[in-house]
Amino acid sequence: MAQLTYKPINLGRRVVWGGFALLLVFAPLVFSSGASLSLLSQMGTMMIFGLSFNMLLGQGGMLSFGHAVYSGLGAFFAIHTLNLMAGGSLWLPVSLVPLVGGFAGMAFGILFGYVTTKKAGTTFSMITLGLVELVFASSLMFPSFFGGEGGISGNRVVGATVMGISFGPQIQVVYLIAAWLFLCTIAMFAFTQTPLGRLINAARDNPERAEFIGYDTQWLRYLTLILSAFFAGISGGLSAINFEIVSAENVSAIRSGAVLLFTFIGGIGFFFGPLIGAVVGVFLTVVFSELTKAWQLYLGCIFIGVVMYAPGGIASILMLNLRVLKFGFYKQLWPRLWRICVTFLLAMLGVVMAVEMLYHLQGDVVSANEMRFFGILIKPHGVTAWLVSATLFAVGAYLFMRCKAPFVATWGDINAKIEAEMQRVAQ
């Protein structure tokens, strides 16, 4: 009988980074419509923003409610730089404007971080919440810099074109964002391998022990925040180039909350978690918001579900399944897995149908007798649609509960075998 052999899950860094680069190159060519390019641009900037936020939360254990301060102020400095370039007062390649945002974010990280990182835990979170509200309130007090309620607009097509690149067409902006995303991702991954990256992990896990062996945890938090603010500023600079307008919303608590939600959904315990979270989050806020008025409800439910049942985020679900696949147990798991997924989706279909009908009845189109649900005309005023919704939920929930126990037993048995084999190999 063949015995299991354990090897660490390592896809090979060259393969991973090469695949990531190819994805960034070919994604704009495959999804080439105007709406798709705009969506890719927003995903790219949010990926950098999420990775920078995860330097604080995932690696340093610092829950910040004010990270938008650094990306937003970086965006304001970037848009002012574009306006200076347009007026002839400054010469700088547009491709380097994100660096202006990065250095602006770093400067404010040095200024604000010295105060906020004096404390850790809940106190740090509350200070950052107060900071973001302070900066947001200041945006209305200094209209010459923040532009008041209308914000500051600019034009990214400035200066001479180089090799036909003017950054006027959206696809050129997408590739600019992709290039910065690749560079920033490499830089932030490299940070995790440095002594500072290891030490901030130690300060997160056991600050008392880190201080006992001679390290100042406040300075570790401070230096990490400065670097995080730099990359957040770069994301803000790219956002300014993409939208050509920056407003007070860029420095608001709403944007800080958005990056927190997206990063947590993706997975704060994995480096690539924020990348997944940015894709899911931007898709929900941009595409879903056009399809349904209840998109915020769905986003909130997804966040609650992740917090309760998958604290490691989507990334942890992928890695756990990858481990099962690596050890050759997926054939044993698959029959249980697809059943529980199908029954869960069936129950959720009934819930979503009820939610959409409620929103339809409470909206401005109450007089409309019909609505479309996945392309099918239904009548929310009638009893039939509600019976179908209730039946879908009841049948799905019943089958889900029937499938849950066998799935949990199989999952536990498989993971017990994997742990036993790993311990055997380690001995």
Q: Which residue stretches match the model-derived regions?
A:
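Transmembrane alpha-helices and adjacent helix-loop boundaries
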Residues: 1-427
